[in-house]
Amino acid sequence: MLKMESTQQMASSIINSSFEAAVVAATSTLELMGIQYDYNEVYTRVKSKFDFVMDDSGVKNNLMGKAATIDQALNGKFSSSIRNRNWMTDSKTVSRLDEDVNKLRLLLSSKGIDQKMRVLNACFSVKRVPGKSSSVIKCTRLMKEKIERGEVEVDDTFVEERMEIDTIDWKSRYDQLERRFESLKQRVNEKYNNWVIKARKVNENMNSLQNVISQQQAHINELQIYNNKLERDLQSKIGSVISSIEWYLRSMELSDDIKSDIEQQLNSIDHINPVNAFDDFESILRNLISDYDRIFIMFKGLLQQSNYTYTYE
């Protein structure tokens, strides 16, 4: 099975692209402000700051860790993803996250960034118009959600001062804002649908991998059962062979010492491990052949001393 690390590679590519985007944003901002700069110096400073922030905040390790978890799941290792799921649904985790959010709010308040500033910053963003001193104020998704929930009110104490020359068409502005909201909603829905499709594909791949693992495990279990049966059959056969040899040995007219020696060798055969048993059989056969060879040499010497000859028939 091939090892998949596509998610980690994608996460690393996104981080590298973010750094390049940060460099481009920094240099373009300096150009718009008419400030001369050294590109290599800007590149080095942005890289140093970017690497420090990504490492010190833990964002890089967090992204790479989640990517590694997804790759492990695609490779059939689900323990890390299960731990992450349990961690995200644990009440202690939720409590710890709430505590971190509260700490960040306290830190922002201590830096002079009050609730009003935080809310306005989360609801609006400012887009600079190139070549002009004016800018465009854009509403974020949070602002859209607040409008839909009825959490935006008009201050009645505000006195609108109309100018005779420049009159603002609020209806057209509202229609324009509504069209932007619809466009943003469509883009969000498209991204959400794309993520749903990707999640379904990942889920299908995980199910397919689980089926393959189940089939392989079933095949391994069958092989294990067959191996155990074969081992028991060999152990039984070895025991019956030893018993047969012992019975045949007792029927021979050999001396008791020889019988005892052969029985000791038979009793030393390993009944549990068939591989060791075959090695023991080989050793016994070698000893028997060696004994037969010595007897034949002795018999041959006696014939020669008695001036007899021998032939094989």
UniProtKB/Swiss-Prot annotation:
Subcellular location: Host cytoplasm
Chief location of this protein within or outside the cell: host cell
Spans annotated as Dimerization: 150-206
GO CC entries: host cell cytoplasm
Region (RNA-binding): 1-149
Region of interest (Interaction with host EIF4G1), residue spans: 208-313
Pfam families: Rota_NSP3
GO molecular function, one term: RNA binding
Disulfide links within the chain: none
Start and end residues of each stretch annotated as Interaction with host ZC3H7B: 170-234
Entry's Gene Ontology BP terms: regulation of translation
Keywords on record: Coiled coil, Host cytoplasm, Host-virus interaction, RNA-binding, Translation regulation
Stretches assigned to coiled coil: 166-237
Family recorded in the similarity comment: Belongs to the rotavirus NSP3 family.
Summary of subunit composition and partner proteins: Homodimer. Interacts (via the coiled-coil region) with host ZC3H7B (via LD motif). Interacts with host EIF4G1.
Function per UniProt: Plays an important role in stimulating the translation of viral mRNAs. These mRNAs are capped but not polyadenylated, instead terminating in a conserved sequence 'GACC' at the 3' that is recognized by NSP3, which competes with host PABPC1 for EIF4G1 binding. The interaction between NSP3 and host EIF4G1 stabilizes the EIF4E-EIF4G1 interaction, thereby facilitating the initiation of capped mRNA translation.
Protein name: Non-structural protein 3
Taxonomic path: Viruses, Riboviria, Orthornavirae, Duplornaviricota, Resentoviricetes
